[in-house]
């Protein structure tokens, strides 16, 4: 497999830690005790985190539960959980999953191919990371990426309906949030640890003051306007009402 500098694949291994930079630069596979014939019955849940922010990567996770391990209680859409609760569930998920993977597509690649294509790429790579044990993928949303290694279906609102998708949403969110804390250490002026790259007033004010850093998505309108330094860009960044208009121009 060719590893792009723009794409980092986190281990499908219960002992790998998403805060480990070295682990994020390689693809590891967990060993599956389940024969290939039985693996066709296992479903991978797939979800993303970070499509909308102005900075940082989009993270996509795939999770296959181990049917021989206890059920995890309290799973939900990651957006409905506190950060503390997500961390607790993350630890249980990676411990009890038969296999899991996380793919990070960085801002440079997002700008190159657009956020939609970056998300589809991440989904395909995440499913590839668990395809040795999963015979089917269930993906949150309304689109199935092309080129998946197994049959799949899209499930609108799946992060509130399917337990494996819920788990994937938690793994993706926790992984991305941890990385944004690392990026905060590199660029403290933006306070990535507070808003995780989303377009909050704090973040927009920092953009106006400091301009974009390498982690910002220059294809997103508020960042592009800040970079260009145009008068209308300054108005869009400083005025919350104008910001909503600017965000409509950004890829969804």
From Swiss-Prot:
Its EC number is 3.1.26.4. Manganese or magnesium. Binds 1 divalent metal ion per monomer in the absence of substrate. May bind a second metal ion after substrate binding. SUPFAM superfamilies: Ribonuclease H-like (SSF53098). Belongs to the RNase HII family. This is Ribonuclease HII. The lineage of its organism: Bacteria, Pseudomonadati, Pseudomonadota, Gammaproteobacteria, Lysobacterales. It comes from Xanthomonas oryzae pv. oryzae (strain KACC10331 / KXO85). Residues 41-232 form the RNase H type-2 domain. It catalyses: Endonucleolytic cleavage to 5'-phosphomonoester. InterPro entries: RNase_HII, RNase_HII/HIII, RNase_HII/HIII_dom, RNaseH-like_sf, RNaseH_sf. The keyword Metal-binding applies.
């Amino acid at each position: 497999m060719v590893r792009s500098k723009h794409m980092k694949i986190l281990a499908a291994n219960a002992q790998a830690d998403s805060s480990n930079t070295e682990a994020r630069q390689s693809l590891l596979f967990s060993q599956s005790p389940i024969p290939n014939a039985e693996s066709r019955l296992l479903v991978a849940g797939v979800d993303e985190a970070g499509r909308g922010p102005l900075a940082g990567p989009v993270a996509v996770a795939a999770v296959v539960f181990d049917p021989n391990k206890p059920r995890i209680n309290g799973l939900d859409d990651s957006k409905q959980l506190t950060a503390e609760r997500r961390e607790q569930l993350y630890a249980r998920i990676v411990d009890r999953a038969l296999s899991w993977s996380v793919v990070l597509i960085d801002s440079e690649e997002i700008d190159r191919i657009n956020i939609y294509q970056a998300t589809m790429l991440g989904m395909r790579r995440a499913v590839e990371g668990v395809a040795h044990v999963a015979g089917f993928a269930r993906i949150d949303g309304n689109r199935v990426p092309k080129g998946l290694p197994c049959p799949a279906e899209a499930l609108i609102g799946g992060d509130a309906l399917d337990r494996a998708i819920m788990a994937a949403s938690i793994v993706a969110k926790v992984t991305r949030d941890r990385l944004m804390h690392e990026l905060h250490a590199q660029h403290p002026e933006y306070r990535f640890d507070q808003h995780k790259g989303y377009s909050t007033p704090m973040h927009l004010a920092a953009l106006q003051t400091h301009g974009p850093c390498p982690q910002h998505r220059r294809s997103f309108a508020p960042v592009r306007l800040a970079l260009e330094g145009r008068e209308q860009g300054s108005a869009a960044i400083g005025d919350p009402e104008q910001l909503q208009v600017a965000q409509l121009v950004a890829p969804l």
